[in-house]
Amino acid sequence: MTPHKWFEWSSGTSELSLRGGNMETHTGQFFRKWLEAEGLFPVNYHPAEGEVRIYANSKQRTIATAQFFAAGLLPTANIPVEFHGEFDKMNPEFTPATTFLSPEYEEAVKNQIDEIYGERLRGLKDRYDLIKDIIDFEESEAYKSGTVTEFSLDDMEITYAVGEEPKMTGTLKAACSVSDALILQYYEEPDAQKAAFGKTLTQEQWKQVSEVKDLYNDVMFAVPLVSCNVAHPQLQLIRSELSQEGRKFSFLCGHDSNIASILTALQCEDYVLPATVENTTPIGGKIVLSRWTNEAGRQLVSVDLVYASAQQLRDLTLLDLKTHPVVVPLTLKGLEKNADGLYKYEDVLQRFDEAISEYDKIVEEYAEQEMDQAA
């Protein structure tokens, strides 16, 4: 879709890049310094069995991410990275797959997509035009051969199948791939003008480029009826880790699709991401749930989204307590925070339980509708 040559990536398709590995180690080092400062980890901590869990999806990029992060977090402990199943295949515990489906449910999902995202989907023309200009689309072989001649606003199709991730065809899917590649190129290429194939873009324009891939991810995974379905295993896993007796630290390494569906299922309110060109799921982002005990013995939980800023990623900045990643406090709809921005532990557990049980409600409601239709 472009006559230009892309940046020479340091890794294979869908694998963790060398820059990504460096940044994960830097992020792990930041968490080590923070945990030591808070008194949770001693210096050169060697955890006892069960105190720390590093668990990754079985894809190359998630295993590698966890390995690099663990090297920064516990550099002398030789902590194992846990993964299950065949290497470079999705583990069902991390796969955002549809596990319940009926015609009535699928129709309701598509109606909900239109209700929540329809206006934004219909307003993508400016973003598409910007991307086409950056990549010199009309000079590409795809355009000249007639393979792809336009970026349409009305050709999106999403299909669902039990045991599989949602699948999209149409312009948004193709434009998402270009948007994703441009943003990765922006992080990897030191010269921002080269990253935009000779164009000079403002930060706002980079955000508009990213909006295409971000909207794709939201449409696929951040729809309430979808999120409680595809995030069901991850919600159970996180809920278990948060209440695990004797556990000091858990690192669960999945994907941006997991972040989108988990936060939607937990009824997270909209948030703004400073210091990045991404809008909802920043590259390398981490949902961080920290459990605290106050002087009165009450347990409290903070919920944050933590990520390296765009400049930190581009500069491979060393992260520590003075030069730290961006921390965005998240708000769970309907739950009360105290003066320190913390939730009651039992309220957070209840929100997880509600999100987990929502799956059963969906199955019950739409299976019943299907039976009524059959009758």
Q: Locations of the language-model features?
A:
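Signature for phosphate-centric chemistry
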Residues: 1-53, 57-250, 254-375
